[in-house]
């Protein structure tokens, strides 16, 4: 096994044999499962390589809103016999969504978060300092919301993955 963090000081207290300085060297560790809990960019950059060798559980599920990346990851997993595990995270009942995906016509998810906990860096329409009351930041598809708020809507991505997909899952984010 291994632990990687782009900030070496955050893993400085761990035994050195556990720390992997360069994530590209993951194959030297022979892991049975790689769990990502950093950022969707880890999946974009390393996801296919991970799945070439082992099972993968990304917690930053918004990366899967990129249809091409999703297709490549699913294809790699099929070809290599590895698995992508989708954690339920904050959403209970993903198994029921998956079981009923052929019967659902519409799936909606609405989330309210305090503005101080939102990353609005990719939101050209809102400035956190200007939000003073309940404000709908976004309403649309999961495919649209995920790249706009990649650190805040992993639950939306989980619902889309388990259910009827990124284009047909309706999302609302309220500050």
Q: Model-predicted segments: where are they?
A:
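NAD(P)-binding Rossmann-fold cofactor-contacting core
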Residues: 1-14
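Conserved acidic residues
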Residues: 1, 17, 32
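A short helix->loop->beta-strand "cap" motif at the edges of active sites that frequently abuts
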Residues: 17, 52-55, 79-82
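Short, ordered loop/turn segments at secondary-structure junctions
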Residues: 6, 61-64, 90
């Amino acid at each position: 096994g291994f632990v990687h963090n782009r900030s070496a000081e955050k893993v400085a207290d761990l035994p050195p044999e556990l720390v992997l300085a360069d994530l590209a060297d993951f194959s030297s560790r022979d892991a049975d499962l790689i769990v990502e809990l950093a950022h969707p960019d880890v999946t974009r950059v390393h996801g296919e390589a991970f799945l070439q060798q082992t099972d993968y559980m990304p917690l930053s599920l918004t990366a899967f809103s990129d249809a091409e990346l999703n297709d490549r990851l699913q294809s790699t997993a099929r070809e290599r016999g590895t698995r992508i595990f989708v954690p339920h995270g904050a959403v209970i009942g993903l198994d029921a969504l998956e079981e009923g995906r052929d019967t659902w016509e519409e799936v909606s998810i609405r989330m309210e978060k305090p503005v101080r906990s939102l990353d609005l860096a990719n939101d050209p329409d809102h400035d956190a300092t200007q939000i003073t009351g309940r404000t709908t930041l976004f309403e649309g598809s999961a495919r649209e919301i995920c790249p706009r708020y990649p650190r805040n809507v992993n639950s939306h991505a989980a619902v889309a993955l388990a259910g009827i997909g990124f284009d047909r899952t309706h999302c609302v984010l309220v500050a």
